[in-house]
Design a protein with these regions (language model features):
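Short Gly/Thr/Asp-enriched flexible loops that form oxyanion-binding sites at enzyme active sites
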Residues: 39-45, 194-212
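Gly/Ser/Thr-enriched, mixed-charge loops and adjacent short helices
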Residues: 40-172, 178
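Gly/Ser/Thr-rich active-site loops/lids in small-molecule metabolic enzymes
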Residues: 53, 206-224
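Conserved small/polar residues in nucleotide/adenosyl-binding loops
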Residues: 244-250
Length: 253
């Protein structure tokens, strides 16, 4: 089996993207996501870059259970596999392509960003630092302060035992940074960088952590207003909302 391997830690979204970009049959991410350090997990993506369905996961598990993990699993030396081309390191060009795709989703439509926006960002000792800061900076946001204690990857999560950015406890250090820097916005991503926590300053100067529903509606309102402003709104638009990951895919026209 030919394997394309990231040479360093990378977020879940880049694995999903690379699966399609490199025309792979599947993608795999070993991660505990936003859970405490004692846990670990295994995320699998199909050739379309989407997480496999429950049915597909059951089929994979059924095949695994047929095997003796010692006698039936084929193994070879890692360096030999690299030498033979069975393992190939993914180049930085793929990360660049991912970031370009993210930037292409912008609805600024040529408007200049507000470079004065002050942002505090924390990757919560996970994988988000390079792709998130690079994307923000390439979009024009340069006033970014990093939560230094949480900048580098550390699977023990020493400053944040439960690194879920949707809970206040995980955002505590970032909140302190935001207050000290009088930031407009606090962003934090969970360790595998597929979940974001957002806190904004209210009229009293206090920082309020947004729920996922609030963030979703704010984004929806912004997208609609920008498309309307620039005459990019399609005729008879429809918004469909998916309430679980097992329901109908969300589409708009």
């Amino acid at each position: 089996i030919k394997v394309n391997l990231w040479p360093r830690l990378n977020p879940v979204p880049t694995v999903s993207f690379a699966t399609r970009y490199l025309h792979a049959s599947a993608g795999v991410m070993v991660t505990a996501s936003h859970n405490p350090s004692k846990y670990n997990g295994y995320k699998v993506y199909g050739a379309d870059g989407c997480q496999i369905t429950t049915e597909a996961a059951a089929a994979v598990l059924a095949e695994i259970e047929k095997l003796d993990i010692f006698a039936d699993v084929k193994k070879m030396d890692f360096d030999e596999a690299v030498k033979e081309g069975k393992i190939e390191y993914i180049s930085d060009d793929v990360l660049t392509a991912f970031i370009e795709k993210v930037k292409s989703q912008s609805v600024l439509f040529g408007e200049e960003v507000n470079k004065n926006v002050s942002i505090v960002y924390s990757p919560l000792n996970g994988t988000g630092y390079i792709p998130v800061t690079r994307t923000l900076e390439e979009m024009g946001y340069t006033n970014i302060t990093i939560v230094e204690e949480q900048r580098l990857p550390d699977g023990n999560f020493p400053t944040c035992p439960y690194p879920n950015p949707e809970i206040k406890e995980a955002m505590a250090l970032g909140m302190d940074y935001a207050k000290r820097n009088n930031a407009d916005l606090l962003l934090a991503t969970d360790p595998d960088c597929d979940r974001v926590g957002i806190a904004v300053k209210d009229k009293n100067g206090d920082y309020q952590l947004l729920t996922g529903n609030q963030t979703g509606m704010l984004l929806f309102d912004y997208i609609c207003s920008q498309r309307t402003k620039h005459n990019r709104m399609p005729a008879d638009p429809v918004m469909a909302v998916s309430y679980t990951h097992l329901t109908l895919p969300t589409n708009s026209r």
